[in-house]
Amino acid sequence: MRASYLFTSESVSEGHPDKVCDRISDEIVDLFFREGPKAGIDPWAIRAACETLATTNKVVIAGETRGPASVTNEHIEHVVREAIKDIGYEQDGFHWKTADIEILLHPQSADIAQGVDALQPGTNQEEGAGDQGIMFGYATNETPDLMPAPIFYAHKILRLISEARHSGKEKVLGPDSKSQVTIQYENGKPVGVREIVVSHQHLVEDMTSNQVRERVEPYVREALPEGWITDKTIWHINPTGKFFIGGPDGDTGLTGRKIIVDTYGGAAPHGGGAFSGKDPTKVDRSAAYASRYLAKNIVAAGLADRCTLQLAYAIGVARPLSIYIDTHGTGKVTEDKLEKAVAEAMDLTPRGIRKHLDLNKPIYARTSSYGHFGRTPDAEGGFSWEKTDLAEALKRAI
């Protein structure tokens, strides 16, 4: 490992155009999981693959679903408008009341369903993966949430500003924003911040970059550890000078375009599959959550300081094709022992993952901004993959 280096990660807010689309797609997944049980539909039977495009006062939703007939286009449109309202868009070019919403959802392909659905009771075949693919999980002990420091603090900056905006404290700031932090590492540990970038939409057209900095700098300083910002830290606040037109009115958004922001900020590999808009039969989502869960529990158990874990699946096949672990020279036991231990400690079939992490719930909209990982598990079952309740089982399996 290099003794000294810089590493940079970025985050975007819930008002970023792509994140607006992620939020809408996940709200629709949640809608099916909320309404299914009311209509007597088994949550295990719910299917959703929902993509969203947002541009100037226009939202297009397309995809495949299976769920209750009670989920009508009118129901979906209401949920979409409420999501846009909650984010904070009431601009001429993108307004929750006036945006044209086009819904193009249709039933899931029977060819896909036949490989994904569990067969009738009494058969010896299991529910298969919803697609082929590779998924990665990662954990490191460099932050309390076992996340890489650059993405951890990039998210934290924007979360603090968002909370202030929603509280009414920062009424002049709009929903759309981005952050980026360049962290200085010494001996593999984060020790300071070299560069800070915040681009934030403002609702008063003639605000200057300096005026925006006066608003956002306190939250940046609150987010970062004491002593990390020095007189050598370089600030870039609204470096283009103006950010009045924001959100989908300024830049078209699509679901699934912020996969590095959603995960580890580039500090770990990514299998390429996006999360939002997908029910948990899609291993792009559920197996990525399981990979993070396992990597985090390995680090939490003290079995490694860093851990990268890969799972691989084939469509219609239940068991993972491979399990790969790399502890980057920090492991207290060999990687092959860890690979055997995780296979013993958790059922890694799609059904096993959904059951272990309790994923058949309306818990997805909350994941759509500020990262799917490094979050706090909540009482409703959200972020269950961030628990460290498997650490003891892994120790026993070694």
Swiss-Prot record:
ATP binds at H16, D176, S177, K178, K242, F243, D251, R257, K258, A274, K278. Its EC number is 2.5.1.6. SUPFAM superfamilies: S-adenosylmethionine synthetase. It is found in: Cytoplasm. GO terms for molecular function: ATP binding; magnesium ion binding; methionine adenosyltransferase activity. K(+) binds at E51. One of its GO terms (biological process) is one-carbon metabolic process. Binds 2 divalent ions per subunit. Binds 1 potassium ion per subunit. It catalyses: L-methionine + ATP + H2O = S-adenosyl-L-methionine + phosphate + diphosphate. Gene3D superfamilies: 3.30.300.10. Residues 108-118 are annotated as: Flexible loop. It is an enzyme of class 2 (transferase). It holds the Pfam family S-AdoMet_synt_N. CDD domains: S-AdoMet_synt. Catalyzes the formation of S-adenosylmethionine (AdoMet) from methionine and ATP. The overall synthetic reaction is composed of two sequential steps, AdoMet formation and the subsequent tripolyphosphate hydrolysis which occurs prior to release of AdoMet from the enzyme. NCBIfam families: metK (TIGR01034). This is S-adenosylmethionine synthase 2. It comes from Rhodopseudomonas palustris (strain BisB18).
